Amino acid sequence: MKNLYRYSCGEGKLDFVMLHGWGMNSNAWRYIINRFGSHFRLHLFDLPGYGFSQSEESFTLPEISETVLKKAPPQAIWLGWSMGGCIASEIALRYPERVLALITVCSSPCFVSQHQWPRISWQVLSCFEQKLEDHLQNTLEQFLLLQTLGTLNSQRDTTSLKSFLFSRPLPKKEVLKAGLKILRYTDMRDSLNAISVPFLRIYGKLDALVPCKIAELLDEAWPHTESVIMHQSAHVPFISHTDDFLEVILYFYQKYFSH
């Protein structure tokens, strides 16, 4: 893909890649890039088919990972939010020499409910897929509402998300369907146990999409990783609780990279 959009900024010495979630674009990071920029050299991507990276094609998880990697710095901390966490994790597994550390935000190694595993039922994803056929914009707006559900400033944060989403071209239906397929079929619960770089998982206590009880299950399954639950947040802690989110990231950074 030739027109993959990347925006780089910041004065820090360490490269830091940020990947957005399903339906969104890299404008999602608008609230935090100024504060992160003094600590890191940020690289924000519109994933293939999203925002300014428009495409008629649909992409698989490996294809997205390889496309992004071609425009990424040689080594970086990789942060992925929601579906972006799947992509960052895929890159960490397949190209570990490119990843200094992995951070996933409100993400899951397995997004669809399995036996004794809390997640979205596949029927919910199927419902979104069906609605995309006739009501793409309304479906995306409904998804944004779910991301802030139950938080103190839900309406304000949903308004912010909408402004970020609609400030750039919307993804095509085929791209969104391919993204839902990634969410439905990806299962990295076993493979991510092999990650050897520092690995931080951030969750929102009020998240209606990624239940925070996943944190405890993965703490046990992946004892070499770390988790933080942000108790007043839902699916977008970097928007609803920007200062707290920055504090969590910087603590992790200083623990492993400040020597």
Curated annotation (Swiss-Prot):
GO terms for biological process: biotin biosynthetic process. One of its GO terms (molecular function) is pimelyl-[acyl-carrier protein] methyl ester esterase activity. The physiological role of BioH is to remove the methyl group introduced by BioC when the pimeloyl moiety is complete. It allows to synthesize pimeloyl-ACP via the fatty acid synthetic pathway through the hydrolysis of the ester bonds of pimeloyl-ACP esters. Monomer. It catalyses: 6-carboxyhexanoyl-[ACP] methyl ester + H2O = 6-carboxyhexanoyl-[ACP] + methanol + H(+). Keywords: Biotin biosynthesis, Cytoplasm, Hydrolase, Serine esterase. NCBIfam families: bioH. Belongs to the AB hydrolase superfamily. Carboxylesterase BioH family. Substrate binds at W22, S82, M83, F143, L144, L145, L146, Q147, H235. This is Pimeloyl-[acyl-carrier protein] methyl ester esterase. It is found in: Cytoplasm. The keyword Cytoplasm applies. Pathway: Cofactor biosynthesis; biotin biosynthesis. The keyword Cytoplasm applies. The active site is at S82, D207, H235.
